[in-house]
Amino acid sequence: MQPRRLVLLGIVALVSLSVVPVASQNASSTTTGAAGTSWTPPRTPDGHPDLQGIWDFRTVTPMERPKEFADKEVLTAEEAAEYERRMVASRDADANRDKEASRGIVNGTPVTEDVALAYNDFWWDRGTRVVGSRRTSLVSNPPDGRIPPLTPEAAKRLAARDVARERPAEGPEDRSVGERCILGFNSGPPMAPGGYNQNVQIVQAPGYVVIVNEMIHNARIVPLDDRPHGNLPQWVGTSRGRWEGDTLVVDTRNFLGETSLRGSSSSLHLIERFTRVDADTLLYEFTVDDPTTWTKPWTAQLPMVRTDDQIFEYACHEGNYGMTNLLLGARSVEKDAAAGGRKSSR
């Protein structure tokens, strides 16, 4: 991640020039705003709601409902303030520097410390507030706010993946797509809060919507002309959009198996819904359906807040020696193991 600066994406610049948002003079469709009041969204020249702008989806609200809230769906204002205070304190990387926390398996060895001291709290940008609805989880269905159980097939698949990650990496293909800077953490799809780079820019042009994620500077170009999905798997699948009233619906399938949302497979089918509910709020909802991974589909809601900030220029592998050193470390582990074997055979 590098200092904030304006990103000029060619495709975005081109489509931006062709769209001038206007407020509809005769719009008959209204949306229920965040405060429960009727609100008419501004519209683009082709008559659709104007979703354009940069939207911030930072929040401390977790994906799944914490057990401490049990059947509580919505927090009171006082409970939300206390939860925010606790979450901000617990995530302070400087204050919690000395606390051991598992960081997974690296080259076959469990890691419990940030030995490189790579990320102090300056670099994190997780957010400090719960979502505006004060829901206890982003998951809205099932009603318990929890992601459904894995299927037996998925449990075996994930266990095998964990075993494979315990051995030293033979090449970059053995590392995650995040470490390889192919896909990034919160950008999805579906989008979900993460550690930083939590903005998304939406640009509309006749027949297209472009979704530009700050993380990994990924841009999804979504056609709205009813074209078929085809059958070519891609990292972020193939997205096709349509309007249902004032809601933009994006249907995505044909994911590569390596993409993996929480252990999902290439059977993943994703439906995203974008609804502008007031001048400063874009309600983002997504439904995940993968019968080879979860026992039933699940849905999450993530209200996004309009921001006047610019998009970070995200740099991942430029000047990054982490992957090279990781693979060098793996070769060192193998060398030490081979030397130990020779000694024991004497």
Q: Which residues does each predicted region cover?
A:
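PEST-like low-complexity, intrinsically disordered acidic/proline/serine-rich tracts
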Residues: Q2-R346
